[in-house]
Every structure is written in C-alpha cells, then in structure tokens.
Amino acid sequence: MVYNPTATFHKKTLTRMKTGLGSNGDILFIQTRALRDQLSSSFRFVYSNGPFFSDPGPGVLPVYKDAGPFRSWLRRPLQNRAQEPRLHMEAIRKCLEGTMKEDEQSGASGQWVGLMGFSQGARLAASVLFESQRRQNIQEKGGIVRGYEGDNIETKLWDQRWQFAVLFSGPAPLIAFCPENDHLSSQSTAEHDPMYRALDNVNCSGELHITKPTLHVIGVKDEWAPSQRELYEKYCSKESSTLVEWEGAHRIPIESSIVKDLCARILVMSKQADFVES
C-alpha cells in the first residue's frame, strides 16, 4: 500500500493506492500512470476502492463520466454522524484487507511497506500510517493494543510495518482508527465539510505527530490547499516530512519534470525508511 506499494527491495515493494472522494481504483490507475512507469523497477502498485458508493468527486466529470461506480472512504457528514465509528472504521479496514488478500492470492509477493493516496485517500493513507506507528510503539513497550476490532487482535492491515506515505492533496485532520483517539474527527469528510475545524479540537503536538516519512504534494491552485498544508504542518514531524508545491489544482500532477522529481523523492524516502534496494 503506500496508498496502496516494492516488497523487499531485492524484489519489489508493494504500494497501495487509495482513491479520493467520488473516484475509484480504475481512475487512479490512469492518473498515476506516469508515476507508476518510472517506479516500476522498485515498487509495485496495488489499487483499492473505498467501501462506500458516492457521487462523482471534484474533477471526475466529465472526463471519467463512464468510469463508475464511484466510491469514497468516508461518507458525507450527515450520513457519517448516523453511523457508529466502529462500524465505519471496520468497513474501511476490511475493504483494504480484502484488496491485499486478492493481490496475494493472484500470485503477487513482496512486503507491504508504503501508502499513497489522493485527496480523501491521502487523508486515509496518513491516518493508517499514524495508527500503524501508534500500534508499533505500544507493542514495543509491551502494552495492550486497542482498536475497533478489539484488544491485541491481529489483522492483516495492522500486522504490516507501514513505513512511509505519499500524500497527493491530502487534507487534515487525521481519521481515528481506535477508540482511544475518537476525539479526532474520525468521520468528517474534511475536504468538503466546512464544520470540520470545529470538530478537530485535538492538540497534535508530541504523541499525535506522524514521525515516519511523509511526502506531501500540494497544488497551489487547489481550493483545499490550506487544509492540506495543515496536515503537513500540524500532524507530521518536521524532521520526517517533505512538502512539494506545484502550479496546479486538485489533481495528481502528470507533468514530466514534476513526476521525475517526485519519483526521486519517493526513492530517497523509501531508503530513509530503512529499505535498501539491492
């Protein structure tokens, strides 16, 4: 996964790709073609759809009008508040794990190491990386790992050692994947919910920082850029996060010079995460 991910670096690292609101894996596959082509010798990309059906998201129409059905990872705010967080987060986890299992059953091999996402999918990728970091820290201290699935329950998603995330247009805040962090606005569709700032009252200093490597790609013409900068500035450690801004709107860049730079940064970041390609 990185949004979803080369396995061990002597083979390939598996990158999981997560779609944005009102999109799907097929659309993201097309949008990341240039990136995928340049990284194919180091990473294998696996694409996952969100668990919920959705209307087309920003920028999807009219180009991808025939590419439905469209999906989302989070429901709209009014729908969200009617759903128990545990059921919502478990639906996301099972959806991701289903994609991982299908990929492995098809004969794929390699270690899941990174997460990559666009828009709402990037928010999810950052949240999975944070939750993985949280659980690893607790395990190393011999503590009880609590999640919506139960205490100390092994699951495919959380058994992976996620190491880094590539975040295209990813907004704040993080999504809570455990009851202990339910003060995070775990179900707000932040990039389209003007009320999300009132819901996000957590102080993200110290223990709520993502300390694993993250690459934030933000278009300066993106109307949701302020929220995306907040994810970078408020929720990620300055020592391990990198910001790349480009002259674009709410989309994944396809310009060759930008893609080349991003690919180089991703390879450096993967090595920073202690994975060395042989």
Swiss-Prot record:
The active site is at S119 (charge relay system), D222 (charge relay system), H250 (charge relay system). GO terms for molecular function: hydrolase activity. GO terms for cellular component: cytoplasm; nucleus. It is an enzyme of class 3 (hydrolase). Keywords: Hydrolase. Disruption phenotype: Leads to the loss of T-Toxin production, resulting in low virulence for maize. Its EC number is 3.1.2.-. One of its GO terms (biological process) is secondary metabolite biosynthetic process. Belongs to the LovG family. This is Probable esterase TOX9. It comes from Cochliobolus heterostrophus (strain C4 / ATCC 48331 / race T). The gene is TOX9.
